[in-house]
Swiss-Prot record:
HAMAP family: NDH1_NuoA (MF_01394). It is a multi-pass membrane protein. The chain crosses the membrane at residues 10-30, 64-84, 89-109. GO terms for biological process: photosynthesis, light reaction. It comes from Prochlorococcus marinus (strain MIT 9312). NDH-1 shuttles electrons from an unknown electron donor, via FMN and iron-sulfur (Fe-S) centers, to quinones in the respiratory and/or the photosynthetic chain. The immediate electron acceptor for the enzyme in this species is believed to be plastoquinone. Couples the redox reaction to proton translocation, and thus conserves the redox energy in a proton gradient. Cyanobacterial NDH-1 also plays a role in inorganic carbon-concentration. Keywords: Membrane, NAD, NADP, Plastoquinone, Quinone, Thylakoid, Translocase, Transmembrane, Transmembrane helix, Transport. Disulfide bonds: none annotated. This is NAD(P)H-quinone oxidoreductase subunit 3. The keyword Lipid metabolism does not apply. The gene is ndhC. One of its GO terms (cellular component) is NADH dehydrogenase complex. Its main location: membrane.
Length: 120
């Protein structure tokens, strides 16, 4: 019987993680239609005829809101496991989390002061 221990599991998962996307791409190349002509080149707008060009400029404020959202979304991803294991981590982890939150509050204050959160 073949037993995997230690790094063999990691190597197995790494090979599978590399093989699945490659297999998906190769399957797409084999199965997908080859040519795009006529109506297949048009963009899709809810079954309606496309109006105007596909390349339009968006206001930079959308980018700033998205950037601030991503920053605080990542904050939530890092703080959730800390909150779940709060009782077992102790005082040092609490102080580290406070420093992390303080850095993010400073970043929020900076964005607010620069006007990144105002829509005018």
């Amino acid at each position: 019987m073949f037993l995997l221990t230690g790094y063999e599991y990691f190597l197995g998962f790494l090979l599978i993680a590399a093989a699945v996307p490659i297999l998906a791409l190769v399957t797409n190349l084999i199965v997908a239609p080859k040519g795009r002509t006529g109506e297949r080149k048009l963009t899709y707008e809810s079954g309606m005829e496309p109006i105007g060009g596909a390349w339009i400029q968006f206001n930079i404020r959308y980018y700033m809101f998205a950037l601030v959202f991503v920053i605080f979304d990542v904050e939530t991803v890092f703080l959730y496991p800390w909150a779940v294991a709060f009782n077992r981590l102790g005082l040092l982890a609490f102080i580290e989390a406070l420093i992390f939150i303080a850095i993010l509050v400073i970043a929020l204050a900076y964005a607010w002061r620069k006007g990144a959160l105002e829509w005018s």
